[in-house]
Amino acid sequence: MNLNLMRMTNAQKDFLLNSFFEQIMLIPSDKAPAWGKMGLQQMIEHLSDSVRMANGKQPHAEIVTPAERLQAVRDFLYSEREFKPETKNSLMGPEPPPLFNESLDLAIAELQHEVKVWVELFESNPGLIVRNPFFGDLDEDGWTRLFYKHFLHHLKQFS
């Protein structure tokens, strides 16, 4: 990996472990999203679900992206482009699921825990590949890029 890519991945990982949570704590729990139907706590719980795919707690065996589109979505993942507002997730229903945690604080703590489990998993298993239902088989760099884009997308949804 070249040095610039390594620096970018390290900065993205710092965002995922620290800056994201510092910024999310500043958002009022009742703030309406700029788009979409999820409230702040639902969004946090949605991110926890996505991290559990990568940390082995909720593996996803199937790739739902058609084979002929897989390279295009992977090219997006490794580009500077961001997720657009209102990006649809075919694994989610038309309405957000009910809340799982009793409070926003508990949801945030859960997400922090899931992110730490993910980081520890990849640090203790160099070269590990874990399947993502949209982007296919990803290594640590791929998951870091995906989570950076995904977390930033939802942070902008509430900023």
Identify what each model region corresponds to.
Residues 30-78, 82, 129-159:
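Short, contiguous alpha-helical
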